């Protein structure tokens, strides 16, 4: 390696380039990029991708989520740390041998972490996007099954009435708000993984409505929403036949709506 190459690959130089590109956590990102690169040439390729705004998770091909390193590929929704709340709620509610579905699974991050926390559970993931299911297949290899299709239509019919818990991080950004999202998301992540329709709750309505015949007699549905959507989401769950409540994690800025059906509920 030449002196010039060494200088350009130095942590201080990387931090300066990342900071100039607007990376808020330049020091941390520099260390991640250095660890991910095999040599100076590959490092430069990674840095060039990052400084033009490509998400760090796409650049290095992975994200740390819920204590697990989750593989990621471009075109798949990047798991946000706030979504760990969904995992924590699901792990709290599910029995050790539960049948759990990670719906709109994306990378399969939720299901993969739940598989590590509930090793006796049966984990099933589903998504309509073949790139997402390919990625989820990597993360759930040896941990669960992955199906391609539209919401519950992806699942085997034998699962009807047998699901103990559905965890779902469906798109919930209102269409009009997409333009205000950070460029990393707005430009690089597929809009279909972000856009939840006029009020952001189109998919939530479908999931709540279509879930009931698939759920066991005592079961739970857990979905992420925005703070301003919480009350409407709770009402949607209630109208679909769930006892609904809202859970928050202020530290993560996370909000989830939780629906419960007990043994006396009927579809």
Segments and roles (model prediction):
Residues 2-44:
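A short N-terminal interaction module
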Residues 27-92:
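Conserved AdoMet
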Residues 33, 53, 83, 110, ...:
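Residue-level signal for inorganic ion chemistry
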Residues 69, 122, 144-145, 243-245:
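Conserved beta-strand segments of alpha/beta enzyme cores
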Residues 82-180, 228:
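Conserved SAM/SAH cofactor-binding pocket of Class I
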Residues 170-202:
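Mobile active-site "lid"/loop adjacent to the S-adenosyl-L-methionine
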Residues 198-259:
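Conserved Class I SAM-dependent methyltransferase catalytic core
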